[in-house]
Structure formats: structure tokens, C-alpha cells
Amino acid sequence: MTEDDALLTARWMVRQYGFDRAEVESWVQDLHFNWPLSVKALDEDDHVVGLLNMSDYRIEEETPQILKDEPELIKSLNAQRYIAVFSFIVAENYRGTRLNYDMLMSIMPELKTNYDFIFIPVLHRLKTHQYWQRWGAKEFYRDADCVCYKLDI
């Protein structure tokens, strides 16, 4: 993906999660998206069927409270190399298929080479907690908004 996919990402996030469009657009601009490692899945007709948006933003940007609650934990996590999953959206008719797996596996060699873990913040109301837990992600912190997972790679 490239920065040219910013509006596409915002549209998908608004449609999928019901977030405010202006807020999502500011996230896309301000949260250090790693466009080269983000994945856009296309079907055989070149329609977008999935987005995996990776970001270089720091854990404390997602959950500033961790600095007060767990200063040693955040210090140890920030001593490692990590990347964040900002959003992972798959079209309704592709859920339950291999698409999620294939999208993540398409970047896994580079992730394993350049990072120690993947930071995965998941809003409490979303259904992807079990998905990441099945991958082996471990909860390391939670706040009022989300649960933070760490997936060692």
C-alpha cells in the first residue's frame, strides 16, 4: 500500500467500525502508518476485499496511561523493535476464509527480520480478541478503551 490508500483506509474504517470520518482521517495522517508493510487484498476483479494497516506508532501513543501505571513494562517493551497493527478489516464475504492468514503471511518474512513483536491494540467492543489470541498474542495491558496484545515473532 502507499499513502494514496489513506482515503480508502478511512472509508473502510468508517464503514466497518462506525468511527467518525474526520477522526479516522486524522488518525491515518498522524499515526505513522507504515504503508510499505500494509496490505491491500484484491479479488480476481481487482476489488478491495481486505486491508491490513501497519503502523510505527508507539504503545504510549495508543494508551498514555501505561506510562503511569506500568513504567517499567513500557520501558522494557520500548527497548525492543515492534510494529503495530492499526486495523485489520476483511470484507464480509471473505470472513472465515484464508484471507486474513494470507495477508499477514505476505509480510511475515519482513516482520520477522525487522521486529521482535507485533503490538496489537484491540478496542473492547471489537470481536478480534480471540483471533489474535489464537495466533498466540498475549495481553500485557488494558485501559478503558482497549486491550493491548503482544505477539512475539
Predicted regions and their residues:
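Conserved beta-strand-loop-alpha-helix junction that forms the acyl-donor binding cleft
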Residues: 90-95, 107, 119-133, 143-148
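Helix-loop element at the rim of GNAT/NAT acetyltransferase active sites that forms part
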Residues: 10-24
